């Protein structure tokens, strides 16, 4: 369970939820006990959970981590929440499951083919779609502001900005 998963668990605990988790690496038993969380395999987590929050990086291993098979074992009242990376969910399969009302609903802040949306997703009344704002915490906004100022100062001092996205343009400009 990573940093984000632990933060979600703390919030879920405030609602007296039973917290199941699945992760590549199990946390220490002492930490599980302190956090009051239970490590289970993915299938058990999907079968037993009312709310499933995905908090994983996008890797070859996690691409389409949730697909047709995984969605089929979820409770008909379960809600799937994805604030991690869009391709973690096979959205075509999700649209089918939501349309057939085989799960309770979904909340998405990220999308498989961002900025495009999977056809049918916006026509569903059992999904909440957000414009990729899950990172909009005070902490991240402060870091974004700090990075912007650092980039401006570097540019004004004639240095290469630390977060330069397109260095080829800078090279072209200096050759003019």
Regions found by a protein language model. Give the residues of each.
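Rossmann-like adenosine-cofactor binding region
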Residues: 25-120
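The conserved SAM/SAH-binding core of class I Rossmann-like methyltransferase domains
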Residues: 22
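Aromatic pocket-lining residues of Rossmann-like dinucleotide-binding sites
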Residues: 8, 12, 74
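Hydrophobic/small residue at the entry helix of a nucleotide-binding pocket
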Residues: 4
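C-terminal helix-to-coil terminal segments
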Residues: 114-176
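Hydrophobic "lid"/C-terminal helical patch
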Residues: 8, 49, 98, 148, ...
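Short glycine-rich hinge loops at helix-strand junctions in the catalytic core
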Residues: 16
């Amino acid at each position: 369970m990573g940093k984000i998963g632990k933060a979600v668990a703390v919030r879920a605990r405030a609602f007296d939820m039973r917290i199941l988790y699945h992760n590549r690496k199990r946390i220490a038993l002492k930490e599980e006990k302190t956090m009051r969380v239970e490590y289970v395999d993915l299938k058990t987590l999907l079968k037993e959970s009312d709310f499933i929050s995905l908090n994983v990086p996008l890797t070859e291993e996690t691409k389409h981590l949730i697909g047709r098979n995984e969605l089929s074992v979820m409770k008909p009242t379960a809600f799937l929440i994805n604030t991690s990376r869009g391709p973690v969910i096979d959205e075509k399969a999700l649209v089918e499951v939501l349309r057939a009302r085989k799960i309770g609903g979904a909340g998405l802040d990220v999308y498989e083919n961002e900025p495009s949306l999977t056809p049918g997703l916006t026509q569903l009344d059992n999904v909440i779609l957000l414009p990729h704002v899950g990172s909009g915490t005070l902490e991240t906004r402060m870091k974004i502001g700090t990075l912007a100022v650092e980039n401006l100062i570097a540019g004004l001092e004639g240095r290469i900005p630390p977060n330069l996205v397109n260095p080829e343009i800078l090279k072209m400009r200096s050759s003019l």
